[in-house]
Every structure is written in C-alpha cells, then in structure tokens.
Amino acid sequence: MFDIGFLELLICGVIALLVLGPERLPTAARAAGRWIGGARRMVSQFTSELDRQLKAEELREELRKAGDVGLDDVEKTVRGALDEAKKYEHMILPDDQTRKPRPAPATRRVTPPSPEAGEQPEPPHEPVRDEAAASDQPSDSSPTSPSDKYS
C-alpha cells in the first residue's frame, strides 16, 4: 500500500524510540496499530460496498435489457397477429361492420312537457300482488311450533 521497505521501517522505529522514549513507545505502537487496522477495515468496507453497488447496477441493467427484449418480442407478435386478423376481417364480418364506427350524432337535451293546469300526472304504478301466491307463503306473524321447524 505505502511500499515501505524494511530499512524505512527500521529508521521510523529508531526515530520513534528517540522521540517518545522506551516508556511511551509500546503505547504509541498499539495506538498506531489500531489506527492502521481501522484504516484498513474502512478501505476494505468501502471497496466491498463499491463492488456490491457496481454488481447491483450491472444486474439492473441486464434486467432492463432482458425486460425490453421480452416486451419488444411480445409487441411484435401481437402487432403481427392484429395485422393478419385485419387482412381477413372482411371475410368474417358483414360489409357494414367492417367500416369503422362513426361517432354518435350530437343529441339535444329533451325536457319532458310540463303538465297543464287541468291535467294531473299519473301516480307511479305499484305491482299487483297475487293473493293466491301470497297465501302460500307463511307470514312471520303465524305461530309455529318447534316441531314444524324440523319436519
């Protein structure tokens, strides 16, 4: 990483021994080791995360391409089938149905005529009940015994 050779490392150790002294050198070496270890872990985490993101992006791109290819094939197939069906449409449908439908003509809003002073509007008709059919159906108010329910 830094390309430090043995000679450079030995020179750094001697300078540290002279500056820090023999009492503080082990503590400083441990702290330096922790810093270097933390830096290595951060670099490895960063590179692994970067690799994961690149792989995920490549996978997304492949999925996009695969999805586009699949949709294009389906679209071509459907368009081909529709074009072929239009060729034979005149054989299946009568002549008046093969033409494209025209839009409906615009209609005016029709208001019902207002009843004149002498005329009364008819009340709505109620359905007429057949009394014979009504008598066949039991009413809720008729007394029934518990044995009737199970027979």
Curated annotation (Swiss-Prot):
Segments of this protein annotated with the region Disordered: 87-151
Alphabetical list of Pfam families matching this protein: TatA_B_E (PF02416)
Segments of skewed composition (Basic and acidic residues): 87-99, 122-132
An example Gene Ontology biological process: protein transport by the Tat complex
Keyword Lipid metabolism included in the entry's annotation: no
TM region(s), chain numbering: 1-21
Entry GO MF terms: protein transmembrane transporter activity
InterPro entries linked: TatA/B/E, TatB
Low complexity: compositionally biased ranges: 134-151
Localization per Swiss-Prot or TrEMBL: Cell inner membrane
Chief location of this protein within or outside the cell: membrane
Protein keywords: Cell inner membrane, Cell membrane, Membrane, Protein transport, Translocation, Transmembrane, Transmembrane helix, Transport
GO cellular component, one term: TAT protein transport complex
Bilayer disposition of the protein: Single-pass membrane protein
Function: Part of the twin-arginine translocation (Tat) system that transports large folded proteins containing a characteristic twin-arginine motif in their signal peptide across membranes. Together with TatC, TatB is part of a receptor directly interacting with Tat signal peptides. TatB may form an oligomeric binding site that transiently accommodates folded Tat precursor proteins before their translocation.
Subunit structure: The Tat system comprises two distinct complexes: a TatABC complex, containing multiple copies of TatA, TatB and TatC subunits, and a separate TatA complex, containing only TatA subunits. Substrates initially bind to the TatABC complex, which probably triggers association of the separate TatA complex to form the active translocon.
Family listed: Belongs to the TatB family.
HAMAP family: TatB
Protein name in the entry: Sec-independent protein translocase protein TatB
Organism: Marinobacter nauticus (strain ATCC 700491 / DSM 11845 / VT8)
Gene transcribed to yield this protein: tatB
